[in-house]
Every structure is written in C-alpha cells, then in structure tokens.
Amino acid sequence: MNLIEQLARELNLKAHNVEATVKLIDEGNTIPFIARYRKEVTGGMDDVALRTLDERLSYLRNLEQRKEDVIALIGAQGKLTPELETQIREAEQLQRVEDLYKPFRKKRLTRAQKAREAGLEPLANMIIMQASAKGSALDAAAAYISEGTGFDTPEAALAGACDIVVETVAEDPECVADLRAFTHNTADIVVEATNADEATPYEPYYNYNEPLRKIPNHRVLAIDRGEREGKLRVRVNVNANEATARLGARWPRRHGVFAPVLDSAIADGYKRLMAPSLEREARAKLTVRAQTEAINVFAKNLEGLLSARPVRGARVLALDPGYRTGCKIAVMDETGKLLDHGVVYPTKPRGDVAGTKRELARLVKKDRVNTIVIGNGTASRETEEVVSEFIAEQAPDLRYTIVNEAGASVYSASELASQEYPDLDVTVRGAMSLGRRLQDPLAELVKIPPQSIGVGQYQHDLDQAELARTLGYVVEDVVNRVGVNVNTASASLLSYVSGITSTVAKNIVAYREENGAFTDRRELKKVPKLGPKAYLNAAGFLRIAGGKNPLDATSVHPESYPVATEVLKRAGVSASELERGGIPDIEKRAGSVAELAGQLDCGILTLIDIIDELKKPGRDPRDDAPEVVFSRSALSIDDLEPGMELKGTVRNVVDFGAFVDIGVHQDGLVHISKLANRFVKHPSDVVRVGDTVNVWVEKVDRDRKKISLTMVQGK
C-alpha cells in the first residue's frame, strides 16, 4: 500500500483528496490557506483535519526513510535476508522497525559479543534449539573451550554461550513486542515516599499503586514531578514469573540436557535485559501520553482564550493592583490609545481609599470611561472592593470586570513592549495590556509567548518544543480564522498570518509607516520579501477597510474577485453595498448556488463561502463567543452558601474538571463528574476557556479557600 492510500485509509478520506492535499502541502502552502481557499481540493477538511494529515504524512515519510536506512545498515553487514527485509518494509510503526534492527545495531562490546568472537555461537544455537547431546551440558561445552579468551573451561564456555542466548532472547522482535504488550496490560505503577514523615503536595501518592493502563494523565504528571523533586520513588511492578513463562513459551522445549540451561538463560534475559528496558519504556510512554494530552488541553484552552469576544466601544480604565507599589492605572479610548496613566494607593500600607476614589472620579469624568478592568493578581480583592464602593457611591452606570494577569509582566518587560512604547514605564505597559485584553483579546495576547498565558496544566513539565509548536498552530489558526486589518495590526499579530514570516510582518509595518495606509491588497506585493507565494497564502486573511475595492475588506480571496463581482452583478447590486453591511438576500437575488457554480466555473464550497461573505462582509467569528460577565458590586467567599446559583466564566480546563471564575477571587472547581448529567470523557467535551456557565455552589471550605461547584442543578 502506498503512502497516499495508507493516509486515506487511516483518516477515512478519499485518496484523490489526500493526493491533491499532499501536493499543496509539498508546494509550501499553509494549512490555514488550504483549509479556507482550497476546499474543493481537500474535500472540505478543516484546519484540525489538515494538521492531523500533515503530521501523519510527516511520520509516515520518516518511517519510510528509516526503513530504507535500516535495510541499508543491515545489508552492509551482510545479514539481510529476504524475510527480514519483508518484515521491515511491512512495519507500520517506527518502534517495530527499531525492534527488528536491534539485534544488528552496533553496540558497546557486550558479554555476548565476546562469546561470539570466541566461537561460542554454535553452542548457543544448540541451547536455543535444544539439540540432542551425549552426557551433560558441560560435556557438550567442553568441545568449545578456547585458550586465552577467558573461555578456557567448560563452565566458562557454557556461561559464554548462555550470554549469547540471553541477548538473542532479549532482542528477539516478537518476544519484545509480546512482553511490551504484557507489561502495558498487566503492570502496576507503584509509588512510595522518599520520606513518609515529610509534608508535601504529593502525600496522596505516598503509598499508591494503580494499573499502568488505567492511571489518568494528570496523576502521571504529578507523580513524574514528585519523582523529579526527590519526594517520590516510582517503579513498575510486573509479574516476573508470568512474564518469564510467556517468554519461555516462545522457544522449543525438548527436555534434553540443555533444557535447564535455556530456562535459566530466559529468566536471566528477562530480569537483566528485558524488564528494565520495558519498564523504562512503559514509564516513558505514560509520560508521552500524559504530556500529549496536557498539550492538547492547553491548546483547546488557548483557543478559547484567543477566541474570546472583543468588547467594542469600551473606554477602559485598567487597574494593575499592588500593595507597596500601589495600583497602576492606564486609561484608553475605544481603539486602545493611551489617554492617561498614574498610580493610586488604596491598599496597605498606605490605604488611601478616599484619594483613590477621587482620582477614579476625575479620570472617569475627564476621559468618559465606561468600563473598569482589574487584574486578578496581588491585591486584586481589595482593589475590587474599593472600585465596587466607588461605583455604588458615585458612578452607578459604570461596570467592571476582572481579567487574568498571566503574561502581562512578561509582555511589559519585553523588547516588543519597549519598541511599541519606548517612553512608558513597564508598569504602565502592564496596565495597558490588561485593558486591551478586554478590548481585543486576540490582538493583545499574540504579543505574549503562548506558554506564558497560563491556561494549561503542568505546563512547565511538558516538552517545551512540542508545546511551543502546538500552541503556535493554535494562534495561527485563530488569527487567520478572524482575519487581520493590515493597516492597524501589530507586527506580532501579522506574523501569525498565513504565509507571513516575522521579517515580512515587520516589513509590512515599516512600509505602511513610510507610505501610509494600504488602500489596495495588490500593494502588498510591493512589501520587501513578500513574494508571490506569500501573497497567495496571505492575501485573503489581510483586510483593508475603506480601501479602493470593498472586496478587500472581506475574506474573499483576490483570485476569486471575478466570481464575487459576477455574483454581485447577477444580484443587481454594487460592491459598495458591502460597505453598508452587506447583502443578506444576495443568494435569492443571484440564483441557486448549484447553477451559479456551473455557470461561473467555481467550486460549490468556494462559492458558498463567497456568498456567505457577501451577505455579511468581514464578519468576526468571535462575536458568537459568550459575552464578558461584568459586575457592579463585589462578592466574597464569605457570601457563598451551598445551593447558591451563580453565573461564571471558565478560566481553565484540566483533566479532572474546570475552574470557573464566579467573582470571588478564588476560582471554583467543577469536577468532571459534576459537569453534566451524563458520562463525560473529558471536560473539554463540555466546556472551554471563556465559556459563560451557570453553576451552583456545592461546598465552601473558607479556611483552605476551596470552592466546589456543580453545573448540574440539584446535584
């Protein structure tokens, strides 16, 4: 089966779609471009399906290359048989290829190799095949004594032959595969404390065991961390007797003089060579599985955060709370432009509540503020109380919300922030970042490394390269799904646009600063290093509002302008209608999609996208996201009682549940069992970061500041 057929079978796709899609990928087209503008080619695959195909394609190509390498390496040793070559070529996993190659891999001089060099392989074969022999095994071994090699007695010769048998058994691909599956299916992970008297976060695992195949991913990561910190001792417990028996069953038994020798070699092979290797491999697989799931959860959480609904028209006063250094203030207009900044000291040690309220009143009036944003970090609760009092006393129409501070300090001290606002202090930049997260979460959060946004689980324990790669894909997909205003976007935002590198993004910003705003998508071709391929991949995602061609403000790709223009013509409307909100009934006016597609020589899926865009040009998919929850009065944990119904916002999703912000400065946990009145495989199947949910208080532990919530009424 060739690669295309295999991909089609595995992913349940049509072979011709797979072949054409692979060609597009190989030509250097991006996943967002292929997903959005080549639907006829792909059969309508979305970006998730395309990334799955791309990753599997890469794996299979690496697999094929490794097969060729292994065949060549074994062939160079003169040990490649037709049967072995067939086994290698038919292998469906890299692990199987490595198992087949293991007996031929060059390694340090082992006991078995020394024995082979001394001519003891024939004796080893006699043991393996249980050959008939006169007398005892030692009598047979006497014929293989070799002076000056260390095998100069029957006992030494027999021991050397056994070393060959041990290595042969331990490296047999079928034996390894069988014992690997046995270990996975039957072994337990056993955890003990290195110091049972020490209080640590890992106490639940001080005397813990669980089947390897059942242990949840979050426990794997917790145990791994405890082991790294020296608090836990971990081992894999396998029934060695049963494992040895399974191994022995794969070799011939004739009850001759070599039977006990073979039994001993098999037991030694498992205990000394196979068990440690398989147990390490089992632990490594657990960790990879857990990390992969954690990265996927992080990715889903990040997507929810980036896809949060912008709060348009908000004139924002952002407060970055603090104690000794005070609360930093940044006031911004609807576009995010800084109007004012300063510091107030409502909290200890100064406790200047009256002065803070006076300054808030002054700024709210002067800058026509309608929304206050408060960071959720240090001193947030005390700051919220002051803001709540101020609203009740002086500004009843004002509203406020709490935003996550994660990553704000990373951005404010970054080179990017110093380039954007060279004359502002880092504290002001941090407060501005909080306010802009409300106005346009996507545009602001792309300035921060995704790993620093804080919506993951055990994120610092994960494979950082894989985490960065996966999260980068998420940012890229969301940015291109939303689209970017090429005349206002930062270089950070532009760098995630399909086909645009960080260098080209900076060149776009430099070009518009030097030449003024872009008025036509074709002008992009004048940007240094933005070549034809980059233009093809990027143009549809870069929007120009108020330009020469109204289609430039839409997601219609320039290559489809002739089709879009003809659709408008048949509908009897001008492109200028797009600037007035679109043409909701264009489909009725222009005729049926099927007929138009045939007449205009355009694919149906592409035509549907064009018509949808003409109905509502430049539509922002984030407008479908839940609205931000605003408050006018503060709530504390002391106000909570079991049974109380509240509206909250999902802040984080983990393997065992979801953390929900209910406005008391301590997120409550909805355990996975309380997310729905049915079985839930993973919390992300029910909620995602940014969702607004109704919850009921189940239990409040005020001393430990823990809140248990449920999303199932009456549960």
How would you label these PLM feature ranges?
Residues 281-299, 452-483, 598-642:
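Long, charged amphipathic helices and adjacent flexible linkers at domain junctions
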Residues 181-189, 319-323, 377-379, 403-410, ...:
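A glycine-rich phosphate-binding loop feature that marks nucleotide/adenosyl-phosphate handling sites
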Residues 49-52, 59, 63-318, 322-423, ...:
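Duplex nucleic acid-engaging cores and interfaces of nucleic-acid transaction enzymes
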Residues 30-31, 42, 46-148, 481-624, ...:
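Accessory alpha-helical DNA-binding modules that contact the DNA backbone or grooves
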Residues 96, 100, 401, 407, ...:
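Long, charge-rich intrinsically disordered scaffolds of nucleic-acid metabolism proteins
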Residues 140-157, 207-211, 225-228, 235, ...:
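Low-complexity, acidic/Ser/Thr- and charged residue-rich accessory regions of DNA metabolism proteins
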Residues 12, 309-311, 476-510, 632-670, ...:
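C-terminal accessory/binding modules appended to enzymatic or scaffolding proteins
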